[in-house]
C-alpha cells in the first residue's frame, strides 16, 4: 500500500511551482480598468473555456454574508465582547480564555454560525449555476463548507486548510479527523441557544446565554481519549487525513488533464494572507499554458502580473454582484 506521501500531491506541487514563478515577476503588476468591458471579457472566457479551475478565498464567503465582525458578531458574541473585549470572531479564536469550558463555548458558537448555518446571500448557489455545465474543480482555503451546502460535487472540491466541521486529536500519532456536528448542537443547547422558525439556533428573547459549557461536554477523542482541537491549518500539527490526500490527488490529476487546454483559472476573493496556495500557482499555470486565461474578482485586491496581462481579466468589486451580471 502506498503511503500518503507517495501519492500525487496537488497542494505542494502547485505551491512549489507558483513560488518559482513569482521570482520572475518582480514588481511588474497589471491593475484592472473598472469598466463593464472586463465583465464582458469574463463572460466570453467562461463561454469559450473547456474547463474552469476555481480558487476561492475568504472574500467569497464575505460576499455571501459570512462576516466576522459587525452585526453577526454583535448578535451572537455580545457577551464575549463585553467581558473579554473581543472585537471580532477571527481574533476571538486566538484569545487566551480562562478555562476549557469557556474556550469550547466560544468555539461551539464560532463553528455553528460559520459552518452549520446557510449563508444569507445566494452567492455560492449562483456561482454553481454559472459553472455547473463546465468541467470544473474548486480549490479553496475556506473552511466553512459552503460549496457543499450549495450543491457543488464534493469530488470536485479540495479544502486545503481544514474544515470547521472536523476535530483532530492532540495526539500527533493519531492522523484521523472527527465529525463534530452532534457535539456542536449539544454545546449550543447547553449555552441556552434556542431554535427559531427556520430550525437554526438563535439568541433567546431574554438574551440569557452562558459563556461556558459543562465540563462533561469538553470534547475528547473517542479513539485515544486525548484532548481534541480544531482541524484547521495553523502549524505542522494539522492533520491531513485520507480524505484530504484523496482531494489533493484529484486536484493534481485535474490540473494535469487540462495542462494545455482552454482552461479558465477563476480566482475569487483571495487576499494577501495565502497567495502561495491559489494566486501564485494560478499565475504559474497561465504563464505556462498559452491557451489558458486568468480571472480575478476581488474587492480592492484585483491584479495580475504583466507577463500574463493579455490573458488576464481583473475585476475590482463585490463577487456576488459580479456573478449576478455574469449569469
Regions found by a protein language model. Give the residues of each.
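Conserved catalytic alpha/beta core of Sir2/sirtuin-type deacylases, generalized to analogous enzyme cores
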Residues: 1-327
